[in-house]
Structures are given as C-alpha cells and as structure tokens.
C-alpha cells in the first residue's frame, strides 16, 4: 500500500521520530515503512536476464499476505534495520540479532582481534526493541 505524505509523516513520529527497532533518529527522508507482519512480496524470474544466463528475480508488485498490507501493520524503521529484518517475524528478527555476536566472533578476524585487546566487550542481555521501551516507559520518559 502506498502511503500519503501525511500518513508517512505520522508513521515516522509513531515512536518519537525514531526507528521502531534500534531507536536511532529517523531523517526526514531515507527511512522505511516496515511491515511488522511481513507481506511476502511475490517475485518471478526475470526472463531477459535468463536469456543472458543470469538468474534474477523481480518483484511483480503482488503480495502473498494482503491482510498484512495495512497502515496499522507498519512501523517506521531505519534502512539498515528494515533490510536486515527482511521478512522475519518480530521474534525471528530478535533471534537473528541475538546471533550477531557469535557470528562476528566466528567469521571476523577483526572482531576477534578487537575482543582480544579489550576493545569489544560482549554483554549477554535480551534484545529489546525501541518500540517496546517506548510503549513501556511512555513517550515522555525517553530521550528525544
């Protein structure tokens, strides 16, 4: 669903002008309207690319979960959070974020070096999204 300028402005301010997930401040432009419950966009193979031996999918414009394509199901998100979330549910997104430390430790010599020299300290704590803090503490309690 395409949002009007007014709807987009209201959505941006839903959690104090911050990303619903990480809490970073959202710029006027460049942020995403995320579907909390994924809409699962329909893709098909790009036949022009296939003629060149390239496998490429393109969006058809359709969605599998049309019921989820509503304004009430949208949260404001920074581009990095929305692109990482893709079509995960909130709990699967939370799980994927919680796995990042171990993934970094396993696959990045830079991470392991920084950790070895005390530049990175691992803290075991649950992933709590900004919107959860915002709703629990109230808009007036959190920094703007």
What residues fall within each predicted segment?
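The −1 position to Zn-ligating cysteines in a subset of zinc-ribbon hairpins
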Residues: 18, 32, 77
């Amino acid at each position: 669903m395409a949002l009007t300028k007014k709807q987009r402005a209201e959505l941006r301010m839903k959690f104090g002008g911050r990303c619903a997930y990480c809490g970073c401040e959202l710029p006027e432009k460049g942020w995403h309207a995320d579907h909390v419950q994924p809409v699962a966009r329909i893709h098909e193979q790009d036949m022009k690319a296939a003629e060149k031996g390239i496998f490429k999918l393109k969006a058809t414009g359709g969605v599998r979960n049309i019921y989820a394509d509503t304004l009430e199901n949208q949260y404001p998100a920074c581009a990095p959070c929305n692109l990482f979330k893709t079509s995960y549910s909130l709990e699967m997104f939370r799980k994927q974020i919680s796995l990042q430390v171990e993934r970094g430790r396993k696959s990045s010599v830079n991470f392991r070096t920084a950790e070895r020299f005390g530049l990175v300290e691992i803290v075991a704590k649950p992933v709590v999204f900004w919107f959860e803090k915002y709703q629990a503490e109230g808009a007036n309690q959190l920094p703007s």
